[in-house]
Curated annotation (Swiss-Prot):
This is Mannitol-1-phosphate 5-dehydrogenase. NCBIfam families: PRK02318.1-2, PRK02318.1-3, PRK02318.2-1, PRK02318.2-5. Pfam families: Mannitol_dh, Mannitol_dh_C. It is an enzyme of class 1 (oxidoreductase). The gene is mtlD. PANTHER family: ALTRONATE OXIDOREDUCTASE-RELATED, MANNITOL-1-PHOSPHATE 5-DEHYDROGENASE. GO terms for biological process: mannitol catabolic process. It comes from Bacillus velezensis (strain DSM 23117 / BGSC 10A6 / LMG 26770 / FZB42). GO terms for cellular component: cytosol. Gene3D superfamilies: N-(1-d-carboxylethyl)-l-norvaline Dehydrogenase, domain 2, NAD(P)-binding Rossmann-like Domain. NAD(+) binds at residues 3-14. HAMAP family: Mannitol_dehydrog (MF_00196). One of its GO terms (molecular function) is mannitol-1-phosphate 5-dehydrogenase activity. Belongs to the mannitol dehydrogenase family. Its EC number is 1.1.1.17.
Amino acid sequence: MIALHFGAGNIGRGFIGALLHHSGYDVVFADVNETMVSLLNEKKEYTVELADGGRQTEIIGPVSAINSAVQEQKLYRLINEAAIITTAVGPNVLRLIAPSIAEGLKRRTSSEPLNIIACENMIGGSSFLKKAVFGHLTEAERELVNRTVGFPDSAVDRIVPIQHHEDPLKVSVEPFFEWVIDRTGFAGGQPVLKGALFTDDLTPFIERKLFTVNTGHAVTAYVGYQRGLKTVKEAIGHPEIRRVVYDALSETGEYLVKAYGFKQSEHEQYMKKIIGRFENEYITDDVTRVARSPLRKLGANDRLVGPAKKIKEPNALAEGIAAALRFDYQDDPEAVELQKLIAEKGTSRVLQDICGIQLHEPLHGIVLKKLNQ
């Protein structure tokens, strides 16, 4: 069975590619990085290291790769032959690979079910990809594709930091991972995917991850940056920052438990586990990397403002929002743009236009108060 995976980066190799290999698939990576493609074809394997005290390693292979930018005919053949297609390319790249997937599906002659799963840090990634792919198909072609091809949405969670190794194929990942897939979106039967969790309702898992992992990571990074700390581990080790993060996750937890029926005790354990992941001494993650793209992360439905709008007293979340508004890292284009908008329009207008926090909302005043403290 062939698994075609778009994206041979650290997440593709260290997370999704490894799980596909464990599930018995012959993994073929599709990427536009010719150096990475050539190395994978030369070595036919790579090393995954668990970032913990044991430094356990395993060899993933045999694997192969194609350059999807130049080996188009081979890509179309693989789309025809694949039992499953996955992606880990980043949300902004899904649109770029959609035309090639669409062309491959047009040429597909196999009547076997095929499932295409976007494993991205976004909500509804597979649905987004399906819409992008279908934009390149006629109505008749869409009907044919719908008969045998599924686009089940998924939620993924694993910290894979920026890293440098002597062996460019080696990748370090944290031991924890979560891959939750909406089983209602599959074409045909549920495929074998070892380590994945299948559910009829993905929403609780998506929001739990977004409002715990992503929220906690963001608050740690933004408040840590304001304190002049360099890494996530340093930031979460600071008593005052840890308190803000813990309080912020307690606030989001209040909403999650009420909205989705998670048991309070179990959610508290999940929350502590997430904070423990930030403390991993074997992962070096700069706060500037985690904090990047503040315009997106300050969006009305994203990790900070989204949960803050859903609870009565979002004091710690408001502190995180205030810290994000102060993020002025010069090497981040969005941070530069954010500070420009604040200078030109004022913080109140930015809260309304970027964050969707209107003047009449209590959160508006709470954030301004935090900024003035």
